[in-house]
């Protein structure tokens, strides 16, 4: 049974009006005719190809609304050059729902060096260019052009992480809320099942979008009600961190758009307050001035109970791409079709990651029964299944059923992480439920192997030697990807990641368990280059650690400042929002912005690549560490240069939109067209 910090007013499926499910949600008039529909109640417009599977947001929302009795159509990756493709299913009777897809469209389209990507894992054939940049804005505007009087509701991760004024890496400026640019009526942030059901039912009952200002997880433009008292974000940066709270209805006023555009400390303060007001148990509404209007954000949605999670994942998905794609491969589908999501949310709080800002810090778990039913569906219905579950987990592999021991403490907590700088004593870190689940899945008829491919929080895993033994003995296939991200305390503190000692402890336990099981397994560590707070010396020390431990890392990535992440605020402002932000007294952070330095940091991670040796030799000399140039084991790069090498890709300039396309790399791996 779930112990909720705060209960929803009504269960998610309380108003369900089951209708016969469509084989696939229709994407054409012909499919609507076959279903006997004269119109759609709701049309969902998405930047992804339509795959009817719970790993794809439009499928979850579409099937959930179908279960509420609505006729739901899908328009996937429409031609955005005119409004006509948005009229393909006719005028929706209730609303247009618009999502950029499973990824922010700019993250999906450009690398960390702002180079154009050639492919798109969420498109048939893996072809890039099937969605516009900032596609949530473009689609919403085309929906409004197609049918001016139909409400437009934004959702998905792109809208969710751009819900307030935010720094945009690709334009290198602060942009206003996506709700303003899209000219939509409402924005639903986070996992929006509760909100979208209530919005749909109330709009269908005749309410206007502006009247839906009491729904959690909703952002809209509205005036501050007279019965609310305002608490300015500046007041939360007092020595007691705003511990003295005003009684009654209170809204926190963030620094205005015009202020955060000009004042970087004001931007950092807004980021800090937003993240501290993310607990559904104690978060208050936020308001931010945009010109002559107030953008209002209601508190975050109430997490789903296990029964509600089961209801969502048990909906009648076809578990396949829409037939209109024929035999075309959709890479994202091929990657996940034999995997199972068992939970949502993450309490790690890594500053470079936006999972917490979208899914929340509270873990939402499926029951064992629901998970086992899905595995049986994969076994029985998914073509090509050979008995191997490719991955079982969620945003992390091993937070299943972990929670605060005391709901009252959880409801009052404003910590950005439950595991940094140390694991909170109020956190239940037992892996027993997860171990039991693994065993039941392995016992399922027809299942030969269950893999845990990535996402293990090693700082949690070392709390359970039994879990590591279970993992290594049964759920690793040759190697396990793991993410220490760095070795040096400076950048790790800015990332809110544990020290390298925790990784070393996990590696010792992993290796011992592998030896005991008679296996030859390996860890593949991930590292980030150019994260805020990282110095050239930090990267040099990381490279020395890699060489000492005989790692030649291909799995590296350059920090990408994604919308709303705390590390993005550090990158943009040079201020650390993890600490109190006060004019003239804020904790400063070094941000690595120059292309030359960013690529130097990545070159340190690939110290073994001869193409990187010239730039590394030059940097080591400038740092006064020419002693690390030579062929001894304790030296980093040799003095000689093999013929035909030394032309590092780091000298190439990024491609801007409209420029010549080129090959690109992701996490250090060459990706072909």
From Swiss-Prot:
PROSITE patterns: RADICAL_SAM (PS51918). GO terms for molecular function: 4 iron, 4 sulfur cluster binding; catalytic activity; iron ion binding. SMART domains: Elp3 (SM00729). Its cofactor is [4Fe-4S] cluster. InterPro entries: Elp3/MiaA/NifB-like_rSAM (IPR006638), Methylthiotransferase_CS (IPR020612), rSAM (IPR007197), rSAM_horseshoe (IPR023404), UPF0313 (IPR022946), UPF0313_C (IPR024560), UPF0313_N (IPR013704). PANTHER family: UPF0313 PROTEIN YGIQ. Belongs to the UPF0313 family. The keyword Glycoprotein does not apply. [4Fe-4S] cluster binds at residues 346, 350, 353. Binds 1 [4Fe-4S] cluster. The cluster is coordinated with 3 cysteines and an exchangeable S-adenosyl-L-methionine. Residues 332-611 form the Radical SAM core domain. Keywords: 4Fe-4S, Iron, Iron-sulfur, Metal-binding, S-adenosyl-L-methionine. HAMAP family: UPF0313. Coiled coil: none annotated. It comes from the Bacteria. This is UPF0313 protein blr7973. It holds the Pfam family Radical_SAM_N. Residues 632-673 are annotated as: Disordered.
């Amino acid at each position: 049974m779930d112990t909720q910090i705060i209960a929803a007013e009504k269960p998610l499926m309380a108003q369900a009006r089951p209708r016969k499910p469509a084989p696939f949600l229709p994407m054409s008039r012909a499919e609507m005719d076959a279903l006997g529909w004269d119109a759609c109640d709701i049309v969902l417009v998405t930047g992804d190809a339509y795959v009817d599977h719970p790993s794809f947001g439009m499928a979850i929302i579409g099937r959930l609304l179908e279960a509420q009795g609505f006729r739901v159509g899908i328009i996937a990756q429409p031609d955005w050059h005119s409004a006509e493709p948005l009229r393909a299913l006719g005028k929706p009777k209730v609303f247009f729902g618009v999502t950029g897809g499973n990824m922010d469209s700019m993250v999906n389209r450009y690398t960390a060096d702002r180079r154009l990507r050639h492919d798109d894992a969420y498109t048939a054939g893996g072809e890039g260019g099937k969605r516009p940049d900032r596609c949530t804005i473009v689609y919403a505007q085309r929906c409004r052009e197609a049918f001016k009087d139909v409400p437009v509701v934004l959702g998905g991760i792109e809208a969710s992480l751009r819900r307030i004024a935010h720094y945009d890496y690709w334009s290198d400026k602060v942009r206003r809320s996506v709700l303003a640019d899209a000219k939509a009526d409402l924005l639903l942030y986070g996992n929006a099942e509760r909100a979208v059901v209530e919005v749909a039912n109330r709009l269908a009952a005749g309410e206007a979008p502006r009247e839906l200002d009491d729904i959690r997880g909703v952002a809209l433009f509205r005036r501050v009600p007279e019965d609310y008292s305002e608490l300015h974000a500046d007041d939360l940066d007092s020595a007691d961190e705003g511990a003295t709270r005003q009684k009654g209805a209170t809204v926190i006023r963030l620094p205005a758009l015009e202020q955060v555009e000009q004042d970087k400390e004001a931007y950092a303060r807004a980021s800090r307050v937003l993240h501290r007001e993310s607990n559904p148990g104690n978060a208050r509404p936020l308001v931010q001035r945009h010109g002559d209007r107030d953008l209002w954000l209601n508190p975050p949605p109430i997490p789903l109970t296990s029964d509600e999670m089961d209801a969502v994942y048990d909906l009648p998905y076809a578990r396949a791409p829409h037939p209109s794609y024929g035999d075309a491969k959709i890479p994202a589908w091929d990657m996940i079709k034999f995997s199972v999501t068992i939970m949502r949310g993450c309490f790690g709080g890594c500053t470079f990651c936006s999972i917490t800002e979208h899914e929340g810090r509270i873990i939402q778990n499926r029951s064992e029964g629901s998970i086992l039913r899905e595995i049986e569906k994969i076994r029985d219905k998914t073509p090509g299944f050979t008995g191997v579950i490719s991955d079982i987990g969620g945003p992390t592999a091993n937070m299943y059923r972990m929670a605060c021991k005391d709901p009252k403490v959880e409801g009052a907590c404003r910590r950005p992480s439950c595991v940094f700088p140390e694991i909170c004593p109020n956190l239940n870190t037992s892996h027993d439920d997860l171990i039991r689940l693994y065993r039941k899945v392995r016992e399922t008829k027809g299942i030969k192997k269950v893999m845990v491919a990535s996402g293990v929080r090693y700082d949690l895993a070392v709390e359970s030697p039994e879990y590591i033994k279970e993992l290594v003995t049964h759920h690793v296939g040759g190697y396990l990807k793991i993410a220490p991200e760095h070795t040096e305390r400076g950048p790790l503190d800015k990332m809110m990641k544990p020290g390298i000692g925790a990784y070393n402890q996990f590696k010792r336990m992993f290796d011992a368990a592998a030896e005991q099981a008679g296996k030859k397994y390996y860890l593949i560590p991930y590292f980030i280059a150019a994260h805020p707070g990282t110095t050239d010396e930090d990267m040099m020390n990381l490279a020395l650690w890699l060489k000492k431990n005989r790692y030649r890392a291909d799995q590296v990535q350059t920090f990408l400042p994604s919308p709303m992440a705390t590390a993005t605020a550090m990158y943009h402002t040079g201020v650390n929002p993890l600490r109190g932000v006060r004019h003239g007294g804020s904790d400063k952070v070094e941000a690595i912005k120059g292309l030359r330095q960013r690529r130097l940091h990545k070159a340190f991670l690939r110290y073994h690549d001869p193409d990187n040796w010239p730039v590394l030799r030059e940097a080591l000399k400038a740092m006064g560490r020419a002693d690390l140039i030579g062929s001894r084991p304790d030296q980093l790069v040799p003095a000689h240069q093999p013929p035909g090498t030394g032309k590092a890709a780091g000298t190439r300039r990024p491609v801007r939109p409209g420029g010549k396309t080129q090959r690109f790399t992701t996490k250090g791996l060459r990706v072909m067209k």
